[in-house]
Amino acid sequence: MVEARNLHGRTRGDRRRYRTESDGPAPSGKDRSLPTTAQASGIRVVGDSQALKLHVLDSIDEAQTIWRSFERRAVASPFQTYAWLSNWYANVGHPTGVSPVIVFGYDQSERLVLLMPLGLAQAKGPRTLAWLGDGLAGYNAPLVDPALLQSFSPQAVDAIWQRIIDHVGSVDILRLRRQPRMLGQFHNPFVHGAKVSGAGGGRLLVLPSTWAEFAAEHIGEGRRTGADCGRYLRQRGRLTIGLSLPTQPRSRVVEKILAVARSQSGKQSRYNPLQQAGVGTFFKALALSESTGFLNVSAVNVDDEMIAGSIGYVHGNCYYLAVTSIEASDDGAAAERLLFEELIRSCIVQGIKSIDFLGATPAVPQWTGRPAPLYEAISGCSLKGQAVVGLKWAGRALGLSTSEHDAFGSGVRQTFKA
């Protein structure tokens, strides 16, 4: 059962902050920090044992306090943290015409249990609603309270999407990509009805409690160990290994890593975020931010020249290895093995439970399992959107389209350009 107040009949100017005088006060109780510009809209979604009231905000800055507070107790990846998405919006989203649509879900006790960071792309072509950060995020998903995941039904998710689309208005396409099958220990109800996409997630390495355990099982795998590689590199020059670099060196190393990694797509996994406009500025801004303690930048240098480097994120007892830069040489191959072993050792010491090789191929494939499946769903919400989606799926069936950015996809957008 779904109950909702009629939200239609407003002009776009009326919806700019998604609030009117008739909307009523912001919620009280445990989550009083909801910004006053959020809409107390009365959208009510009833699931199996959860009744959610949705509130929508179109300002990332005004959502900061409640977002940061909620992400500390919610199930989420680093790609849905405020630090990540606020930097993404400033450097990638806003310049490309994406408008934020931040959805808060409250339970019957007015406790925040759901946060859906969405973006509406409307600069050109069909108006597309997608996860905020789409195209750069390794995984797209909401932030969810663990208690909600225990009872949340796919039918409730469908109702939420319908209410959001009705509220935003004039949405042509709902596009949901790179969605993981699991949210923490729970099945992700937001992949209900979605298809397995061609792009996979990262290869997961589950870490033991001690380095000795890892060494006993894995160090003999491969032609050379990290120790062998270290001895080899010391013969080449002065070897330095920097893990978790501080802010200023971190920014300079990020520039080097991105410059090399862009030209070495073969060393990347299927997740390669470096082709999107504004990504370089995004990573540098993230590296310089003192508030982003989860960002990890590491490098192996010989005579002060970077041979291998990586950018990763620590979140929820998992290290997400997102970008790697390896020199195409014997020195680079040795530095890669040494860097990965040192990262693994450091993670074990810090008590991190796993490493997700999201943007890299493990130095030794036997270390990890198969890539995790990711799910995508794309649906037309208007006649224009249905036509675009139909052409896109037809193109894929004919083998003409493999991504949103290829020639066929561009042609489809031009055909229906607003």
Q: What do the predicted segments below correspond to?
A:
Residues 99-100, 107, 121-198, 315-376:
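Acyl-donor binding region in acyl/amide transferases
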